[in-house]
Amino acid sequence: MTKTITRVALIVVACFVLCGASLAAPRSAGVTEPPVFAFYPQAGIAWADLYFGNFVDLDPGPGVLDWSCGSQTYDGHSGEDSLVRSFREKRIGVPVFAALDGAVVQVQSGLPDEHVEKTMTQVDNHVIIASLGGHVRTVYGHLRRKPFVRVGQRVRAGQQIGWTASSGHSSWPHLHFTAKFDFQVYEPFAGACRTGQSYWREQPPLPAAPYAREFTFSPQPFGGRRDPPWDTAVRTGTFTRGTRDVYFRIELGFFGGSPMQVTFTRPDGSIAFDGVEATRLRGGRATWASWHERLDLDQLGTWRLRLAAKGRELADAPFDVDRPGKRRNRPPNPVSLSLDPADPTGADVVQCLVRTSLVTEDPDYDVVRYRYRWRVGAKLVRDVTSAALSDVLRHGVARPGRRLSCTVTPSDGKRRGPSAAVSVSVR
């Protein structure tokens, strides 16, 4: 087996040189502690298509300490870094939302948004919102060139304010989210080293085991990093019968670097290859690895590649072997939906969550985008296409007694998969 291993150093740094237009917000009395956030202000699902690369550094000295007593941060880091899976998703679009009602007090825009190298002098595109009479400020950093809001504008929780990008001091598309109470940074996550109340309505737990965030096959070698201009390898789920080079790549979260069990199975269930490969990857950060195997693809039909570590299956990836000239583009696989909260009131921010396999979103392993269409009764109130596995409808749009629905259609950019829908009566 020929093997290429790459570690993505996703220690993505947030650096805010707070410049651009600004507006002071009036202060009010009576607010004694930070509010609880109803949702994370970025489209996607935590520890699925969103990966938290860094939390707030709670160590006042030169060391590092995150809320779980781990080291998922760096010295002086002032917020949460939530990463999307690639620059391809960034270009499709991953929305960023206001976490609370408030007033926009600062906007920086118009700067390049696909940085892959970190330079301390680089300023990012960002938005700052003041809430609760100015006691709370939320910062949304590394955005695309053109945020959706302007200084002085009033916004509601769940309102889209921009798109995820990699502007400023950044090496990967992500949102840097900072929460401040009375101008002091605080950590919304609660745990062993940040005791007390969590400031998330539903705090996502840390993964208990490694998991696959993305997977693809290719008939060609992969390049190095997956940032612009990207490797030129063709994503595929179909190979031609014969002796072929099969390249495959997996992105992993919370992987500890243990040996990887690699097994190729023919359509009749027989084993074409079974081996253990060292990975040399270290845990804590998102990492990705690619290998290739020269296989005798001697049977037509659906083959499977299974990757496992420490007895845990990380990927079960099917691919087809066909006759020459039979390669085709297939639509994305079906998805299922849920709403959060499941029984919303008119005052709730509502999320539409997509459930799908992170390995087999698409049978050809294409990057999938999702069209979200929200309706209140028959009226279309939001229509957006993004690469994220969730979308958000701001509070106040759905009135009590009305029917709220979310319809999602997956697409690979050429073919649409089957639409899914979910609906509920608003209390």
Spell out what each predicted region is.
Residues 325-427:
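Ser/Thr/Pro/Gly-rich low-complexity disordered regions
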